[in-house]
Curated annotation (Swiss-Prot):
The chain crosses the membrane at residues 16-36, 68-88, 98-118. It comes from the Bacteria. It is a multi-pass membrane protein. The gene is nuoA. This is NADH-quinone oxidoreductase subunit A.
Amino acid sequence: MSMSTSTEVIAHHWAFAIFLIVAIGLCCLMLVGGWFLGGRARARSKNVPFESGIDSVGSARLRLSAKFYLVAMFFVIFDVEALYLFAWSTSIRESGWVGFVEAAIFIFVLLAGLVYLVRIGALDWTPARSRRERMNPETNSIANRQR
């Protein structure tokens, strides 16, 4: 690399280099300022989590059902779908009928996926036993009478 080429690269990217230096310097300044201005209390109560003035009871680790993660994933998927459809709706005049057909196919594929999720029971919150009881109430009442 010749001297003129490296000078051209530096001249071309000087603003980004200054931005990086200022950003890293600001982060370091805030960390050092927090270290100097922060408290130094070393009591036993410093290691206990604070919950609005109430002593904590039990474990803070809660086991969540996988259903919550599924719902979160479905939300992200359909939120991205809405993002794509919004982008399509802003350019509907330029895309014409071809864009309309492509958007319709996109919606159809996502609706087919949603129907599939409903059919396999991915969106059901109740266990299979209570779902059977809800579907066949006469069988459930006969079983209760025999007991």
